[in-house]
Swiss-Prot record:
Species assigned in the record: Haemophilus influenzae (strain ATCC 51907 / DSM 11121 / KW20 / Rd)
GO MF annotation: an example: glutathione transferase activity
Protein's name in the database: Glutathione S-transferase
Residues noted as binding glutathione in the record, renumbered to the chain: 10, 53, 65-66, 103-106
GO cellular component, one term: cytoplasm
Amino acid sequence: MKLYGLIGACSFVPHVALEWVKIRENADYEFEPVTRELIKSPEFLSLNPRGAVPVLVDGDLVLSQNQAILHYLDELYPNSKLFGSKTVRDKAKAARWLAFFNSDVHKSFVPLFRLPNYAKDNETLAHTIRQQAVEQILDQLAVANEHLESHIYFGENISVADAYLYIMLNWCKAVKIDFSHLTQLSAFMQRVETDQAVENVRKSEELKV
């Protein structure tokens, strides 16, 4: 089984999931770091025509999209409890947060990493778009912060949902979004970093917090 990913990108999440599987069920995997140039190459486009990560290759199965990969791994390795539990109800709660982070919060970062073409030559418009993106991200993170006021994680135990929020908080630091007023988030990051799989992947991807 091989996972293709960009260092520090959302592919961090299935990378952590595979590391949990390795630790908990002794199932090995390979992580193939790629560059933004490589994901547009004919070789990579044959795996994912969208030229995006993550991509998981398991035999003749090629999967893209984080949620598809994570649900596949959870079905394949139920004892690893990638959604924090083996019960349907608890897994559904973690899956709901995963969907929020993947579909809503992640999307809000796009203008910060890649401005729309129509704004690239208009600094005033570009500034407005970036500012609106930051405000939206902070509004969304406030929802997560409120949950953490009464919960340790976003599942019954640490799960792929937590790994997703963790890597996005790293992005916040990278683009200098100050979330210090959301007082639960820094403590959450510290809790997640105590997990062995997260620590292993952080070292593997050489992430700096």
